[in-house]
């Protein structure tokens, strides 16, 4: 039986074992999937022992995505662009492939919810690792342009400069947004986890069709509520579909079988 696990600290809250067990049942794959919680500075020892013991693949979450990025023998283009790895796979020759499926999970969920992204004008709020991990997949999906807004404008600009050869991408602080309209706004910050909001003008929602929050809760997140208060016609969604989507992409990297995510999203949401 092929064995997998998710690495993080803390990790007891992770839904990855549930999601991958459901994927395996759906696709008639026989796997074992568990949790691993190394000490904050113990990732390399733990992951080396993990693969030495015969495990096939791992998911990696906070705070170890950069450690996994450095550990991999080879990186996919999307992992290199993200400068972080959330999926490790031991290939038949023994080498370790590092991948990042976060952006693919977001793109798949946005397309599932609202159709193709081709020609859409996007605003990404925040300029941290969550933002960096999704830019290349979004540009590959042929969005018209991406604008990154961040409290510290220079950090947003650095991120835009990094990807400017891949597509039309601009940046600003929260207080000097360009006077353009956005079709889709994605909150890449974790502000909703404690009921907060990004410190950005509500005018961003004027004429926007969609607002997406990367975080998720049992009820609508504070960002989703805010978007609908500002523009009642806007369609909103949280990041649970992204979570399941990135897991499905990892499952495909390992098993070469692509699970159907909608039934799994429904099951996981009922358990929130």
From Swiss-Prot:
Known pathway: Metabolic intermediate biosynthesis; chorismate biosynthesis; chorismate from D-erythrose 4-phosphate and phosphoenolpyruvate: step 4/7
Residues binding NADP(+): 126-130, 150-155, 214, 239
Enzyme Commission number, as recorded: 1.1.1.25
Active-site residues from the entry: 65 (proton acceptor)
SUPFAM superfamilies membership: Aminoacid dehydrogenase-like, N-terminal domain, NAD(P)-binding Rossmann-fold domains
Stored Pfam families: SDH_C, Shikimate_DH, Shikimate_dh_N
GO biological process: amino acid biosynthetic process; aromatic amino acid family biosynthetic process; chorismate biosynthetic process; shikimate metabolic process
CDD domains: NAD_bind_Shikimate_DH
Catalytic activity: shikimate + NADP(+) = 3-dehydroshikimate + NADPH + H(+)
InterPro entries: Aminoacid_DH-like_N_sf (IPR046346), NAD(P)-bd_dom_sf (IPR036291), SDH_C (IPR041121), Shikimate_DH (IPR011342), Shikimate_DH-bd_N (IPR013708), Shikimate_DH_fam (IPR022893), Shikm_DH/Glu-tRNA_Rdtase (IPR006151)
Subunit composition and interactions: Homodimer.
Family annotation (PANTHER family): BIFUNCTIONAL 3-DEHYDROQUINATE DEHYDRATASE_SHIKIMATE DEHYDROGENASE, CHLOROPLASTIC (PTHR21089:SF1), SHIKIMATE DEHYDROGENASE (PTHR21089)
NCBIfam families from the UniProt entry: aroE, PRK00258.1-2
Protein name, entry field: Shikimate dehydrogenase (NADP(+))
The species this protein was found in: Pseudoalteromonas atlantica (strain T6c / ATCC BAA-1087)
Lineage start: Bacteria, Pseudomonadati, Pseudomonadota, Gammaproteobacteria, Alteromonadales
């Amino acid at each position: 039986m092929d064995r997998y696990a998710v690495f993080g600290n803390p990790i007891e809250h992770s839904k990855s074992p549930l999601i991958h067990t459901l994927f395996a049942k759906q696709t008639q794959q026989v796997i074992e999937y568990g949790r691993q919680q190394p000490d904050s500075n113990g990732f390399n020892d733990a992951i080396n022992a993990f693969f030495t013991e015969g495990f096939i693949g791992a998911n990696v979450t906070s705070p170890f995505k950069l450690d996994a990025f450095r550990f991999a023998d080879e990186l996919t283009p999307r992992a290199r662009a993200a400068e972080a790895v959330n999926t490790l796979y031991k290939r038949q020759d023994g080498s370790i492939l590092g991948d990042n499926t976060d952006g693919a999970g977001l793109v798949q969920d946005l397309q599932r919810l609202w159709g193709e992204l081709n020609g859409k004008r996007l605003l990404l709020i925040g300029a941290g690792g969550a933002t960096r991990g999704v830019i290349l997949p979004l540009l590959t999906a042929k969005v018209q342009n991406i604008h990154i807004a961040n409290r510290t404008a220079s950090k947003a600009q650095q991120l835009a400069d990094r990807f400017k050869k891949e597509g039309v991408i601009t940046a600003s602080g929260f207080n000097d947004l360009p006077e353009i309209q956005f079709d889709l706004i994605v909150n890449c910050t974790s502000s909703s986890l404690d009921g907060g909001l990004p410190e950005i003008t509500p005018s961003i929602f004027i004429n926007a069709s969609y607002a997406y929050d990367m975080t998720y809760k049992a009820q609508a997140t504070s960002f989703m509520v805010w978007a609908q208060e500002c523009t009642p016609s806007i369609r909103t969604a949280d990041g649970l579909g992204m979570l399941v989507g990135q897991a499905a992409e990892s499952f495909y990297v390992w098993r070469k079988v692509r699970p159907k995510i909608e039934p799994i999203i429904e099951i996981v949401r009922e358990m929130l």
